Amino acid sequence: MLFGKLLPREGNFFELFNQHAGFIAEGARAFIRLIEHYADPALREKHANEVGTAERQADRITAEVNRLLHKTFITPIDREQIHGLINAMDDILDLLQDASETMTLYDVQSMNDDILRLGDLSARCCERVQHAVSLLPKISEPKVAEAAIKTCEEIDRLESDADRVMRSAMSRLFREENDVRELIKLKTIYEQLESISDRCEDVANLIEGVVLENS
């Protein structure tokens, strides 16, 4: 009995999830500012740096979650769910940073409508991820569990929208772009942006699993 009392219990996992999700939303907003003001080199650099800052701050939280997971005996949800969720969330910011860096590395000259649409859908997915994560501490309450599932379904729909935009963008790119180098640049960026919404869907699926097992 005394041994059980001495073991670390629960931990502040939900608080750390919320902090990380806040950086996801922050990074997504910075990314939108980046593509909206891409023509201005100073603003482009500023907003790219903001994406990088959000990614580094989130990395520290991911490390703290994994550290806490190793020292906590009793966790609020399954240990594998905690590990899978924080790493999937971290992947979202990694992809946001990858996309912003690729634009600079490939010397993309301007943003087209397809990039703007894919960026917008990715950012909306990130915002919904933040909301879904914020509901986790109270998913034992039926109304909160229902709201979490609904939010995850919204993420799924946004990801489907991103898939459609991606297919249309790729079709147009291969029909209309004659410069092979430009085609390769844009294809890479389209794929990176669509991967963000894919990873948000992965997070949504993990959250749905947590809700179904714990509500």
Please report, for each region that a protein language model flagged, where it lies by residue.
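Cytosolic, long alpha-helical scaffolding segments
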Residues: 1-215
